[in-house]
Amino acid sequence: MVITVAKELPPAYEPEHIARALKLADVIAARAPAHDRDASFPFENFADLSREGLLALTVPAALGGIGAGARDTARVLGIIGKADPSTALVLSMHYIQHLVMARSTRWPGRLSRKLAKETVEGVALINALRVEPELGSPARGGLPATIARRTATGWRLSGTKIYSTGAPILKWYAVWAKTDEAETRVGLFLVPAGLPGTRIEETWDHLGLRASGSHTVVFDDVVFPLDSEIDVRKPDDWKVPDFTQSTVHAIFVAAIYDGVARAARDWLVTFLQERVPANLGAPLASLPRVQEVVGGIEARLAINARLIESFASDFDDGFQLTAIESNIIKLTVTNNAVKAVEDALQLTSNHGLSRTNPLERHYRDVLCGRVHTPQDDSTRVSAGRLALGV
């Protein structure tokens, strides 16, 4: 029995947006090898996603979007992640921002409505730019070096952001910066892409997720309006993370890497069914040892499906969840995904690591799950400290 997230309901009961994602998946998957090889950005994927209304998946229905919750969004990300995880990662960051807009009391309504309208009408993506060369990820603490200076006519922004996923296509940046006020505040400012003084340095040359366009964005005295504050507070007020941001980020990232493992599993099954070594005279799939390893892969993917489904459904139903719980699920799902692909490589020998076969690419992509925030060591330390009361 094969358990998948994408097709767990009879087709007649599938929401329309799931059907649209499934329809696009084959097209997106066909483009993935070339974009991976060239580290080129898949602009055409986002044009297709926009045409199908899927960029507005988490935009509230009242604002013209689909209004999907975490469960359906995780399913879409799993489908697209299986086809091309680079595209799915950019998409996930965009989805998270619109979920936060819809649920946060801190996002200015005028700004969230403007961005919702643009997303419904065209290709208008947003991502949070947070990571810096010296700071690393702010998830581990510390103040950003990027600074917003207040003037009579607008904010003036200077700083450098690295690993800015989707940089080639983003229309909006939610930039993590500190102010130059007498009492420093820190938080997010909404900055339009392409303003004078902004430049993208194409620094992303990674082992995996090569088509995600996670380049460096440099702000050199960039001017933007004073009313573009999203959420700027005293540093101590950020000790408790935004609930929506922290929980859905972890589960959406997990869904993407689970999708990668499912792509690897599908290729493996076909390979084992078709590969007939001369000394065996039968497909590799006939060997008990092979069946056992594939069964182990199925077990890991079945666990992943249940974890993602149950957690996302609980979030949608309003259950009280914690960031630590979501981080543990991300840790478990991504490590299951990595192990599933490693087991697939074990069965395929040189074939699996050949660049003519997709398993090599899936392996490079799935390894990124181990370094993607929240990282495993941080999750374990947080869970351990909570259990020990320290």
Task: Report residues per predicted region.
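Generic structural signal for well-ordered, non-transmembrane alpha-helical segments
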Residues: A19, G259, G295, A299-A302, ...
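Glycine-rich phosphate/pyrophosphate-binding beta-alpha loops
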Residues: I162-A167, V248-F252, G369-H372
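Glycine-rich beta->alpha junctions and the first turn(s) of the following alpha-helix
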Residues: H206-R300
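Glycine-rich phosphate/cofactor-binding loops in nucleotide/flavin-utilizing enzymes
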Residues: N350-V390
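Register-specific recognition of a single heptad position within extended alpha-helical repeats
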Residues: E8, A12-P15, F252, G281, ...
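Glycine-rich flavin
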Residues: F43-R51, L57-T160, T165
